[in-house]
Amino acid sequence: MEERCNAIDDDCDSVNYEGCGYGPGFMQVTASWDTGADVDLYVTGPLGDTLSFQRPSTPSGARVDHAGRGDCSGDMPNPQIENIRWVGERPAGGIYEVEAHYWGECITGGGPTNVTVSVAVGREIAGQYTLSLLPGERVRV
């Protein structure tokens, strides 16, 4: 099976997203969704730093390298994907909190939206989670 850029390891090689236009890192959190809605991904680290489209990088090497906008933005590759990764040094040890937020319905998206969030550590899938979000809802994964 071929990789489909959907936050699921479709080809079962324990590595997500080969050829999807965004990169892996020592740690990586990716969200994908199934409507034209704009869904935002937030990751808060043990030092209290929150990464999102509003704060796309930290001095520790974390960065948002793809922030999809669903149907809210016209000409964007992979508009239903958000990807946060840590490059360079290992991320700080501790607990990381991941949240998904159904920001808006955009032009054609709307209603309940299924969101898949995957977490990879050392380029290996550590967990995949599926949520159903309603407009305006923000949920801890």
Name each model-derived stretch.
Residues 1-24:
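Extracellular calcium-associated, cysteine-rich motifs in secreted modular proteins
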Residues 16-141:
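Intrinsic-disorder/low-complexity signal
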